[in-house]
Amino acid sequence: MKGDNPFAICGLIMAAVLFLAGCGQKNGENYHPDPAGEVRAETGRCWDAYLEYARGDDVLLPLSRSGTNWYEESLNISPVDAFSSMVVMGLTGKADTILEYVADSVDYVKDFDVKVFEVNIRILGGLVSMYQLSGQKRVLEKARDFGDRLLPAFNSPTGIPYFWVNLKTGEVKGSRVNVAEAGTYLLEMGMLSYFTGDPVYYQAAKRSTRAIYERRSEIGLVGEVIDVETGEWINPSSHICAGIDSYYEYLYKGWLLFGDPELKQMWDESIAAVLRYIPEKRDSLTWYGRVDMHTGEHTSSVVTLWDAFMPSLLAVSGHVEEAEELQRTWDWLWNRYGPEPMIYDYRKDSILNPQYDLNPEIIESAWYLWELTGEQRYMDMLQEYWEDLLEYCRTDVAFTALENVITKEKRDYMATYFLAETLKYFYLAFADQQMYTLKTTVFSTEAHPFLKSALDPERVNRHLGLAPWIDRSG
């Protein structure tokens, strides 16, 4: 390079270094050279905080450095919920500690009522996933025992489970449930049937799902609240919001995981009705509000942050264009407030509940779209969401909820799903790994990974009691 100006060369080199260092930055924000490692470290820090301040309790309260329980006694929800994230992130020591504790010290002979839906997705789902990931027979025994304690709830005239069940006596109560509480059992119960060889669990879940589907309206929509004893609709509002959301999720994912053709038929008809009646355009954005299940007429423009899961479901089921359109709406709401508010009215442009509880749904959807399309804008979203959580929700102990997304006032609660879902989805998005992908794995509504690639199709059919199906719903 005889005759070249050495200072000019140094300048070019420095410019190149600065350019490369800036790759991955968004709008000049802090650059994270190893975001997967950062998420992994933060997960370990949160778990250590749980052990220090809330060991043996269900939930960590980061601001008061204490713990709390859902019911009269602990059900050890945080450890069971957190296990699969520890495995996915390679936090082997922490995973082994949880595994040993659950296998040796946890029991569910508890003389109090529990919410069937909530403990199914967290505890039963966590235990069954724990067994698949570890092969620990004592964990499968715990899962079967817990599943048996939930089964009495399904002994209703319709097959739809009661809201409450006593884990010791099997007594039930609560005859009005929403559709999500009625139809979010197929994955957990199905995996339990697969591993135990007893179809009773999957068949109970499927009977409940079928009971909802067969009560759909003439235009193919379901309502929100139903009476488990009479099968009559109490609330005819139809939507994809909290209260119905995971019913639709499990129709598709149940088929995806187990290949049950009845679920695929239910899904195809259901999603066609949803896409026909529920989306609403407002100022270049697409919202999924609430409609009357019988007429399809829009009745409300109230949405919840849980609804942000829908782009992930649309994307994985092949409706990518609709998924991208809806994700743009939720990203707009996040950008407006930082973390998104819990309840928002899009017609009135009004926040009805300003809390943010470390929810994973928008992160889940951004990861699905990143995984399925490879479009850089979804990675940009994920990086922004992570930076916002670090800025607004991180504490010197762990992470905590926000009381108000406008003021960023913190609230003393770290939901168990933050360990199970939110951190896991961030890690999966940022990490270079091929074990837990959308091709190999079906993630439950609590983000517990079920390895589809490890299931034997013949065993699935036999253990779940799958048989040729005839549509008799009319």
PLM region spans:
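Hydrophobic helical h-region of N-terminal Sec-dependent signal peptides
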Residues: 12-18
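C-terminal motif of bacterial Sec signal peptides marking the signal peptidase cleavage site
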Residues: 20-22
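Extended rod-forming repeat segments used as scaffolds/tethers
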Residues: 11-12, 252
